[in-house]
Regions:
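Core catalytic region of metal-dependent phosphoesterases/phosphodiesterases
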Residues: 73-182
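Conserved beta-sheet core of the metallophosphoesterase superfamily
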Residues: 227-310, 318
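N-terminal active-site segment of His-dependent metallophosphoesterases
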Residues: 25-108, 128
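Beta-strand-turn-beta hairpins that frame and shape the catalytic cleft
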Residues: 46-60, 171-172, 178-190, 217-219, ...
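Acidic/histidine-rich helix-loop elements
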Residues: 56-75, 96-98, 127-138, 257-268, ...
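Hydrophobic alpha-helical topogenic segments used for membrane insertion/localization
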Residues: 10-33
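Active-site neighborhood of phospho(di)ester-bond hydrolases with catalytic His/Asp-centered motifs
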Residues: 60-63, 88-94, 117-123, 174-176, ...
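Binuclear metal-dependent hydrolase catalytic cores centered on His/Asp/Glu-rich metal-binding motifs
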Residues: 132-133, 138-171, 175-177, 183-224, ...
Length: 320
């Protein structure tokens, strides 16, 4: 018999609420794992940084592909990106999520290698992913696989083979290097670093001397995997016209209407994805942080943060 104070009906209501919450949670997990992580998109941005009179120039920014064998949807989408016919492809690392992913990755990126490209590595181009506590990201950036605090021996990836494959395709390695390319009559001076998340960055400065068109107008583009503030400060103070980075996955799991909860580095979470302006010592530089294309195969889930490539259309600076 139910008590007169209605406690039985109260417990029944509470049970229904708990059941609804559990069902909602399960639905969100299924959506994030089965739908959103394969719901690829191209984010388009425009930025006026080219010399006066320059024609529009398109840059396709790829990052955090995290490919594993069998990811056919991702590989098919990567091949289709060639239809964008970019003037330049910039790959900011973390291409792999499996020791056997190099050949499938190079096949998927093959059509894009018909276009000029540059690249830098991320930690997941050196080491295979590990199973980590996802709540650990709220305490700060994940530890390096090389860290002394790690008790597990990291599984090394064939980084040399990956970079050789990119090089065979004509892409330029910017790992702690500087290089000039003349594209559509504009001299692009690139300066790249090895992954700051591994504390491997060494600054090469900007290219010296001349490319094939030494008198061409210069545009300085800095490239890094992880957008740590020290790296953004350095390139901004070194007069970069644009900085491109990845690593954050855009937060990977976001709250609708709020955004990223973590950035996996010291970048403020509101900067975890998108085109923003970085300030340092009175200077400013636009920074594009890609939300990434993949996830670690140990955490195959995205929520309110679709996987993306970024198509940047660079245009001429306005006439003063």
């Amino acid at each position: 018999m139910a008590r007169a104070d209605g406690s039985s009906s109260g417990w029944a209501t509470l049970g229904k609420v708990a059941g609804l919450a559990a069902a909602t949670g399960a639905g969100c997990v299924a959506y994030g794992a089965l739908i959103e992580r394969n719901w690829f998109t191209v984010r388009e941005e425009s930025l006026a940084i080219l010399p006066h009179g320059s024609a529009p120039f398109t840059v396709l920014h790829l990052s955090d592909i995290h490919l594993a064998p069998g990811q056919e949807k991702k590989m098919g989408w990567l091949r289709e990106l060639a239809r964008l016919e970019p003037d330049l492809v910039v790959n900011t690392g973390d291409n792999l999520s499996h020791t056997e992913a190099i050949r499938p990755l190079l096949d998927a990126l093959g059509p894009l290698m018909d276009f000029p490209g540059v690249f830098v590595p991320g930690s997941n181009d050196y080491f295979a992913p590990r199973l980590n506590n996802p709540f650990g990201y709220f305490r700060g950036p994940s530890s390096s696989p090389e860290s002394r605090t790690q008790r597990r021996v990291p599984i090394k990836l064939d980084t040399a083979a990956l970079h050789a494959g990119f090089g065979m395709g004509g892409w330029v390695n910017l790992t702690n290097r500087a290089q000039s390319l003349v594209l559509k009559g504009i001299r692009f001076d690139f300066s790249g670093v090895d992954d700051p998340h591994l504390n491997r960055e060494k600054y090469a400065g900007w290219p010296r001397g001349s490319a094939s068109q030494g008198s061409a107008p210069h545009v300085k583009v800095a490239v890094a995997h992880a957008p740590y503030q020290r790296v953004l400060d350095h390139f901004t103070n070194d007069r970069a016209d644009l900085i491109l980075a990845g690593h954050t996955h855009g937060g990977q799991v976001c709250l609708p209407g709020y955004g990223a909860l973590v950035s996996n580095c010291d970048l403020p979470t509101w900067r975890a994805k998108g085109l923003t302006v970085w300030q340092s010592d009175g200077r400013t530089t636009p920074v594009n942080v890609s939300g990434g294309i993949g996830t670690s195969r140990m955490a195959p889930f995205r929520f309110a943060c679709r996987p993306e490539a970024v198509l940047l259309t660079l245009t001429a600076k306005p006439t003063v």
